[in-house]
């Protein structure tokens, strides 16, 4: 073992240790280039191959960098998702509003790219410059001044500047109150339709004006319901009188200083139990302001006694009694008028809820006709005349009829005598003929009498039918208007038996022929039987009155003789004794029966 510890540096130059000189001398090959080539050729098999660590175990710093990169990518994806959800797309830069409105072909606004694509830098698309579109943010407009109706914040006003303002308001209403506006209201298409009850949804009204409206609306409303969930306010206004949508919108827009476009106004659903419960239970909320008594339609849908009344089954006899009392015999009139009673009549509500309404209407009308026909047949002619004129309202003068008969040159005493036997329906005295030139008032005189005494009219135009004389079976008095020569031939051939006052067989539709006597019959015609020798057998059966003079009118085309229901009522009252009509005290007190007809088990003075 050498005793020297290290390299001898005594012969080294200044500044150098001389170590490299010794090591260079120990090398087998002094050529530096050959040494480097040999080093690279040997690779890992060389003596210095252990200097490079080839283990698969990664350093701790590389794993942390990978985790950081993954977290960054996940965070970027979440940010892009939030941008898609909450950010509104940018509008395309607009050069001019007028220029944008003059597009020849429909343009499509570019959508904002939410996910950014990173360019590798290796290739560039040739159309990359064409796809670039400059995007700008559309600045929000300043809020409109209060004088123009815009009192909401600028944010609210900008939200409402869209194509469908109503859809935005409906959405905000549902978000605020948790119920759809259309579930509480029914639609009025016309702004002129009047209604007492209105549901109003108002957007972005000032709180101080809403508080003031609570007092201002009390003078207009019988009931007021108000609840506010900013920025929406909900009103239920039951006005003293009916108002149209235009009137209500003007009232609320001026009172709350809001634009009419920010108001939804429709009438409430008055037959919906769910809607009524919304208002009823809402009024118990301390945040709801309520003034006045509940409207009738809320009470009807929510109170217990009304609900028990609705459960009552439909009673047809009650409907028939109502139609009989109202003197309704037509199906359409019965159906319409009875449906209008649904708000106040439990049986009418049960009728509307039934699936066989048409069947019940037909049966009701048929039964009323049966009762009316039986009532008429049970009355004498005196009782029938008294029954008819007692229902005529208003005052008239009997002298209008007398003056008209004298104007036509008739002897009133003779007319009164023939009219008396006519009403008595004596054989061969039960038919009167009123003839004369046109426009002499024949039909007007006869029709006014038929209307006052509720007579029936038959027309020879229907003579081809076997049932054209069927209305005579339901009449106390009848009229055959404007008989022509063909009609007289038919009467002479087939109706002489009926004019004699004998029983005849009358064809009835869907029924067997009816055995009956003709009621008193008035015939109007332009043909005088006295001058016609072709009908000698009718001369003794028909008494003729001639109207030779044209009916007079004044300068305003108003008839000079008032032949009205009131005139005929006065005529019969004045000449009741001369016509030998029976005293009504013998048939009943004041010409009426002691008790009205009853076809249902209804209560009378608390008794059934």
UniProtKB/Swiss-Prot annotation:
Q: Domain (SF3 helicase): give its ranges.
A: 410-560
Annotated segments matching region DNA-binding region? 148-311
Q: What's a GO cellular component annotated to this UniProt protein?
A: host cell nucleus
Q: Where along the chain is ATP bound?
A: 436-443
Q: Where is this motif: Nuclear localization signal?
A: 83-85
Stated EC number for the protein is 5.6.2.4
- Kindly report the protein's main subcellular placement as a broad class: host cell
Modified residue annotations for Phosphoserine: 88, 96
Cross-link named Glycyl lysine isopeptide (Lys-Gly) (interchain with G-Cter in SUMO), where?
A: 517
The GO annotation for biological process reads: DNA replication
Task: Give GO terms: molecular function aspect only.
Answer: ATP binding; ATP hydrolysis activity; DNA binding; DNA helicase activity
Tell me which InterPro entries the record gives: Helicase_SF3_DNA-vir, P-loop_NTPase, PPV_DNA_helicase_E1_C, PPV_DNA_helicase_E1_N, PPV_E1_DBD, PPV_E1_DBD_sf, Rep_E1_papillomaV, Znf_lg_T-Ag_D1_dom_sf
Q: Which Gene3D superfamilies match?
A: 3.40.1310.10, P-loop containing nucleotide triphosphate hydrolases, Zinc finger, large T-antigen D1 domain
Kindly state which keywords UniProt assigns to this record, in alphabetical order: ATP-binding, DNA replication, DNA-binding, Early protein, Helicase, Host nucleus, Hydrolase, Isomerase, Isopeptide bond, Nucleotide-binding, Phosphoprotein, Ubl conjugation
Q: Which reaction does it catalyse?
A: Couples ATP hydrolysis with the unwinding of duplex DNA by translocating in the 3'-5' direction; ATP + H2O = ADP + phosphate + H(+)
Query: What post-translational modification does the entry describe?
Result: Phosphorylated.
Cell compartments where the protein resides: Host nucleus
Quaternary structure and interacting proteins, as annotated: Can form hexamers. Interacts with E2 protein; this interaction increases E1 DNA binding specificity. Interacts with host DNA polymerase subunit POLA2. Interacts with host single stranded DNA-binding protein RPA1. Interacts with host TOP1; this interaction stimulates the enzymatic activity of TOP1.
The job of this chain, per UniProt, is described as:
ATP-dependent DNA 3'-5' helicase required for initiation of viral DNA replication. It forms a complex with the viral E2 protein. The E1-E2 complex binds to the replication origin which contains binding sites for both proteins. During the initial step, a dimer of E1 interacts with a dimer of protein E2 leading to a complex that binds the viral origin of replication with high specificity. Then, a second dimer of E1 displaces the E2 dimer in an ATP-dependent manner to form the E1 tetramer.
Family membership: Belongs to the papillomaviridae E1 protein family.
Name by which UniProt lists this protein: Replication protein E1
Q: Which organism is it from?
A: Human papillomavirus 22
């Amino acid at each position: 073992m050498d005793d020297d510890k290290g390299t001898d540096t005594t012969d080294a130059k200044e500044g150098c240790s001389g170590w490299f000189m010794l090591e260079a001398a120990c090398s087998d090959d002094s050529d530096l280039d050959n040494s480097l080539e040999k080093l690279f050729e040997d690779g890992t098999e060389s003596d210095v191959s252990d200097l490079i660590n080839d283990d698969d175990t990664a350093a701790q710093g590389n794993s942390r960098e990978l985790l950081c990169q993954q977290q960054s990518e996940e965070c970027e994806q979440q940010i892009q998702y939030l941008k898609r959800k909450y950010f509104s797309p940018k509008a395309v830069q607009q050069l001019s509003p007028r220029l944008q409105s003059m597009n020849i072909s429909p343009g499509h606004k570019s959508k904002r790219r939410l996910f950014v694509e990173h360019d590798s830098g290796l290739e560039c698309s040739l159309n990359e410059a064409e796809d670039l579109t400059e995007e700008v943010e559309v600045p929000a407009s300043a809020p409109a001044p209060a004088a123009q109706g815009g009192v909401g914040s600028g944010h609210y006003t900008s939200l409402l500047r869209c194509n469908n303002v109503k859809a935005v308001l409906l959405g905000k209403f549902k978000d605020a109150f948790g119920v759809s506006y259309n579930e509480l209201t029914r639609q009025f298409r016309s702004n002129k339709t009047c209604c007492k009850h209105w549901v109003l949804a108002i957007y972005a009204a000032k709180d101080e004006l809403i508080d003031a409206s609570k007092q201002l609306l009390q003078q207009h409303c019988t009931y007021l319901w108000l609840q506010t969930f900013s920025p929406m306010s909900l009103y239920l206004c039951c006005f003293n009188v009916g108002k149209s949508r235009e009137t209500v919108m003007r009232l609320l827009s001026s009172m709350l200083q809001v634009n009419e476009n920010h108001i939804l106004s429709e009438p409430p659903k008055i037959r919906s139990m769910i809607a009524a419960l919304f208002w009823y239970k809402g009024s118990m909320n301390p945040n709801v302001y309520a003034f006045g008594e509940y409207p009738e339609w809320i009470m009807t849908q929510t109170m217990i006694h009304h609900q028990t009344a609705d459960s009552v089954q439909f009673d047809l006899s009650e409907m028939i009694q109502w139609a009989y009392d109202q003197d309704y015999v037509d199906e359409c009139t019965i159906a319409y008028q009875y449906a209008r009673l649904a708000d106040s009549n439990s049986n009418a509500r049960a009728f509307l809820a039934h699936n066989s309404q048409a069947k019940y209407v037909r049966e009701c009308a048929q039964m009323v006709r049966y009762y009316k026909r039986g009532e008429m047949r049970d009355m004498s002619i005196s009782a029938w005349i008294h029954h008819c004129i007692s229902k005529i309202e208003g005052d008239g003068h009997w002298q209008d009829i007398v003056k008209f008969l004298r104007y036509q040159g008739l002897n009133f005493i003779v007319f009164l005598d023939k009219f008396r036997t006519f009403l008595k329906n004596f054989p061969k005295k039960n038919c009167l003929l009123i003839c004369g030139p046109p426009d002499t008032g024949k039909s007007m005189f006869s029709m006014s009498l038929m209307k006052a005494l509720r007579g029936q009219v038959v027309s020879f135009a229907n003579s081809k039918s076997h049932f054209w004389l069927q209305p005579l079976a339901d009449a106390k008095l009848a009229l055959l208007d404007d008989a022509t020569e063909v009609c007289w031939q038919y009467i002479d051939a087939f109706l002489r038996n009926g004019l004699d006052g004998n029983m005849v067989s009358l064809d009835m539709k869907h029924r067997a022929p009816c055995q009956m006597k003709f009621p008193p019959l008035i015939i109007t015609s332009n043909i005088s039987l006295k001058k016609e020798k072709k009908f000698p057998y009718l001369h003794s059966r028909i008494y003729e009155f001639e109207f030779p003079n044209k009916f007079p009118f004044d300068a305003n085309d108003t008839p000079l003789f008032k032949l009205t229901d009131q005139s005929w009522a006065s005529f019969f009252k004045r000449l009741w004794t001369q016509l030998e009509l029976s005293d009504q005290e013998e048939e009943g007190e004041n010409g009426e029966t002691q008790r009205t007809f009853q076809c249902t088990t209804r209560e009378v003075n608390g008794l059934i």
